[in-house]
């Protein structure tokens, strides 16, 4: 499945990623089971943890989840966490990963902060990571550096420093995500996604261009 592959790929990043397992029913139909992250086991009982997505942190309506910017949602999520630099890096890494994998559905409800049992807030493990590019979705869900397409290393550099990260940390994060996604193109050529030959070639071509733009 699409999302199962990209969740596994995302585990190469140096950020938390949602735990998931691909299962099949008796008819062989596949389904993805994702572990809940909004609860913790205490004395044998599950205690709910507070979770707020970026839209909620900004006090916006549900309909606004696509009308905000990457800068707005990342700033809201990162500033809710005491370890702001760690949170900002996680936000940057998630948006870079989304661009390099063709995930055009990284909207304001897909970036959240969670309050741990000890009361500290942190960025929630990355989740909802499908590639939507094979289905004609060629843009980011939210604008970044003023645009949704043709994103470059310069655009992500501006985005990261705007979140308060030192330029060296931004460059390191960009390189980390590029390394983490290095197997992607070969995996796609090898049939990692259930696409026909033409769709696979088109996806590889577009993602290769995105990588080139971030490597420059």
Residue ranges and their predicted role:
Residues 1-13, 69-135:
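Conserved kinase catalytic-core segment
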Residues 1-65:
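Conserved ATP-binding subdomain of kinase catalytic cores across diverse folds
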Residues 16, 83, 164-167, 194:
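Short coil/loop linkers at secondary-structure junctions
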Residues 25-27, 91, 172-183:
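Small/polar glycine-rich anion-binding or flexible loop at a beta-alpha turn
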Residues 31-36, 182-188:
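A short beta-strand motif that forms the metal-chelation/ATP-contact edge
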Residues 53-76, 113-171:
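Catalytic-core segments of enzymes that bind and process phosphorylated/nucleotide-bearing substrates
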Residues 67-71, 88-92, 172-173, 189-190, ...:
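Short coil/turn segments at secondary-structure boundaries
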Residues 79, 120-123, 162, 188-216:
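Regulatory N- and C-terminal appendages and interdomain linkers associated
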């Amino acid at each position: 499945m699409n999302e199962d592959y990209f969740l596994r790929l995302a585990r190469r990043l140096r950020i938390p990623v949602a735990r998931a397992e691909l299962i099949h029913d008796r008819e062989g139909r596949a389904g993805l089971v994702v572990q809940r992250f909004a609860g913790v086991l205490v004395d044998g009982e599950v205690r709910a943890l507070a979770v707020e997505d970026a839209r909620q942190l900004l006090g916006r309506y549900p309909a606004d989840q696509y009308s905000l910017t990457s800068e707005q949602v990342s700033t809201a999520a990162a500033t809710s966490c005491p370890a702001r630099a760690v949170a900002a890096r996680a936000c940057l890494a998630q948006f870079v990963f989304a661009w390099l994998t063709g995930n055009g559905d990284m909207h304001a409800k897909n970036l959240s902060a969670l309050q741990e049992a000890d009361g500290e807030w942190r960025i929630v493990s990355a989740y909802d990571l499908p590639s939507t590019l094979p289905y004609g979705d060629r843009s980011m869900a939210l604008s970044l550096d003023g645009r949704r397409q043709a994103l470059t290393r310069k655009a992500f550099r501006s985005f990261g420093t705007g979140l308060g990260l030192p330029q060296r940390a931004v460059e390191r994060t960009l390189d980390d995500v590029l390394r983490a996604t290095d197997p992607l193109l070969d995996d796609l050529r090898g049939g990692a996604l259930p696409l026909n030959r033409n769709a696979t070639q088109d996806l590889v071509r577009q993602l290769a261009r995105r990588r080139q733009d971030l490597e420059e």
